[in-house]
Each structure stands twice: as structure tokens, then as C-alpha cells.
């Protein structure tokens, strides 16, 4: 499955830890606070628990969208082309 993770976190330290966790699970940043990538259900469950621990008590809003490959393949991007990515293709 593919996921798109978007977040709004006011605290720099917490925001950086969330970004590091998303990268550690193989997701790639496509915007400042948006990550995308392929992840299996067991790892997604682990990631959700890790994000809950990281953001406990913080002013943090994280939304995880589960999307299928078709959604990734038909995404529309406006702006310069993104750098080559290993875990997802967006055009």
C-alpha cells in the first residue's frame, strides 16, 4: 500500500523527530510537511505507534492517507519536476 502523510507541528524538535521517523520507514518528502511512499500494513502500524510516542503532549496534527498505486500514478504535480525518488513516482 502507499501512504501520504501530512502534518502540522509547531515545535521544531517534535517536527524534526516526526520527519526523521517518516524517513526511517522509507517515506520520502515531497513537500515541507508531506511525505509519501510504499509501506506494508505491519510497518504502518509500527509507524503510527512511533508517531504517537513522538508527539505525545505536543501540539501536533498528523493525517495519514492510505492510497492505491493508481492514485500515485495519476497524481498531478504543478511546479518543477521533483528529484528522482526510489520509493514512489509522481508526475
From Swiss-Prot:
Residues where Mg(2+) binds: 8
CDD domains: Cas2_I_II_III
GO MF annotations, alphabetized: metal ion binding; RNA endonuclease activity
Enzyme class: hydrolase
Essential cofactor(s): Mg(2+)
EC number in record: 3.1.-.-
Keywords in alphabetical order: Antiviral defense, Endonuclease, Hydrolase, Magnesium, Metal-binding, Nuclease
Gene3D superfamilies in the cross-refs: 3.30.70.240
A biological process from GO: defense response to virus
InterPro entries attached to this UniProt entry: CRISPR_associated_Cas2 (IPR021127), Virulence_VapD/CRISPR_Cas2 (IPR019199)
Keyword Ubl conjugation among record annotations: no
Family matches, as NCBIfam families: cas2 (TIGR01573)
PANTHER family in the record: CRISPR-ASSOCIATED ENDORIBONUCLEASE CAS2, CRISPR-ASSOCIATED ENDORIBONUCLEASE CAS2 3
Record's subunit section: Homodimer, forms a heterotetramer with a Cas1 homodimer.
Function according to Swiss-Prot or TrEMBL: CRISPR (clustered regularly interspaced short palindromic repeat), is an adaptive immune system that provides protection against mobile genetic elements (viruses, transposable elements and conjugative plasmids). CRISPR clusters contain sequences complementary to antecedent mobile elements and target invading nucleic acids. CRISPR clusters are transcribed and processed into CRISPR RNA (crRNA). Functions as a ssRNA-specific endoribonuclease. Involved in the integration of spacer DNA into the CRISPR cassette.
Membership in a protein family: Belongs to the CRISPR-associated endoribonuclease Cas2 protein family.
Name listed for the protein in its UniProt record: CRISPR-associated endoribonuclease Cas2 2
Organism in which the protein naturally occurs: Pyrobaculum aerophilum (strain ATCC 51768 / DSM 7523 / JCM 9630 / CIP 104966 / NBRC 100827 / IM2)
Taxonomic lineage of the native organism: Archaea, Thermoproteota, Thermoprotei, Thermoproteales, Thermoproteaceae
Name of the gene encoding the protein in the UniProt record: cas2-2
Amino acid at each position: 500500500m502507499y501512504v501520504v502523510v501530512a502534518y502540522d507541528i509547531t515545535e521544531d524538535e517534535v517536527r524534526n523527530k516526526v520527519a526523521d521517523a517518516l524517513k526511517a520507514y522509507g517515506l520520502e518528502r515531497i513537500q515541507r510537511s508531506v511525505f509519501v511512499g510504499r509501506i506494508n500494513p505491519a510497518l504502518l502500524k509500527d509507524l503510527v505507534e512511533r508517531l504517537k510516542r513522538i508527539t505525545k503532549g505536543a501540539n501536533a496534527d498528523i493525517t495519514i492517507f492510505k492510497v492505491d498505486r493508481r492514485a500515485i500514478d495519476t497524481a498531478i504535480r504543478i511546479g518543477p519536476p521533483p528529484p528522482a525518488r526510489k520509493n514512489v513516482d509522481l508526475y
